[in-house]
């Protein structure tokens, strides 16, 4: 099974290599990061770096070349500045990010919770974004630069809010779209199960179930084409062991869904019930007091 999967992956990579264009771009910044970026006929970047952090540097540069808009909007979002651009709709997310004080959390735990290896990759990625800004000195997103490694880490933390549904619940509260006690009590979980089956798919098919004896991985994560979690396709490899192709999010230095010569991996998204909202009864005589039962 593993052998056949390897053959399938190697075959896929071989086909991809045959479609690469002859032109290569080698990028090097002042801090010593260096990567080679080669585009195939579909425009997908194939990125090589001697070290893992060099490959991450190249990934960031290529991604910024193709989709700086979504990367820039993510940085605005991560820094709790969405309200400045989106008004009230963005202010809900800003409030939550500031209330949870992610900056202090990351500052306190950056070195203790992340290995040196991971930090180097993140720092290489941030350097790649900043180098793109340096090369494209007339771009219209200058205000988000420089991007720091902690900005990248903050993106991972905040994405948990998106996938858990917390951010959308806070936004719903701020917009005043709350349900009355009568509405809540009259709703049956069994009658509303259709609300809880929205999600995405990842299916592995073993060789005994395929007509050619291959192992296949089918991934449909139902991600949007725009925004903070829009997929971007790339192939990244390094002399330290990286060799992976698949999709990543704007501002992320790793492949989230994809394959290498040994394995394939996917990611799914659903709508789990992870948030509880409590409506307080405010003292009409003093808005700073609420009923404690």
Q: Predicted segment positions?
A:
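Compact, glycine/acidic-enriched structural inserts
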Residues: 244, 249-293
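Bacterial N-terminal signal peptides that target proteins for export
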Residues: 1-7
């Amino acid at each position: 099974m593993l052998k056949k999967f390897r053959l399938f992956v190697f075959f896929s990579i071989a086909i991809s290599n045959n479609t690469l264009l002859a032109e290569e771009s080698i990028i090097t910044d002042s801090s010593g990061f260096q990567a080679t970026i080669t585009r195939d006929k579909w425009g997908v970047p194939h990125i090589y770096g001697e070290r893992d952090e060099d490959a991450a540097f190249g990934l960031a540069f290529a991604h910024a070349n193709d989709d700086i808009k979504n990367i820039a909007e993510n940085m605005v979002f991560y820094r709790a500045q969405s309200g400045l651009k989106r008004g009230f709709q963005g202010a809900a997310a800003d409030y939550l990010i500031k209330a949870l004080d992610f900056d202090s959390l990351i500052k306190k735990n950056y070195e203790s919770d992340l290995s040196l290896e991971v930090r180097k990759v993140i720092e290489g990625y941030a350097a790649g974004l900043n180098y793109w800004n340096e090369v494209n000195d007339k771009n219209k997103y200058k205000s988000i630069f420089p991007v720091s490694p902690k900005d990248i880490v903050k993106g991972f933390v905040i994405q948990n809010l998106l996938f858990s549904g917390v951010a959308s619940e806070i936004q719903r509260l701020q917009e005043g779209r709350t349900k009355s006690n009568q509405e809540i009590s009259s709703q049956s979980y069994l009658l509303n199960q259709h609300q809880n089956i929205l999600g995405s798919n990842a299916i592995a098919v073993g060789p005994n179930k395929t007509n050619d004896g291959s192992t296949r991985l089918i991934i449909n994560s139902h991600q949007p084409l725009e925004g903070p979690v829009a997929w971007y396709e790339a192939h990244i490899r390094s002399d330290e062991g990286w060799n992976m192709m698949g999709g990543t999010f704007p501002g992320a230095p790793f492949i989230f869904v994809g394959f290498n010569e040994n394995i394939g991996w996917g990611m799914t998204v659903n709508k789990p019930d992870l948030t509880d909202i409590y409506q307080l009864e405010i003292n009409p005589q003093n808005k700073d007091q609420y009923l404690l039962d």
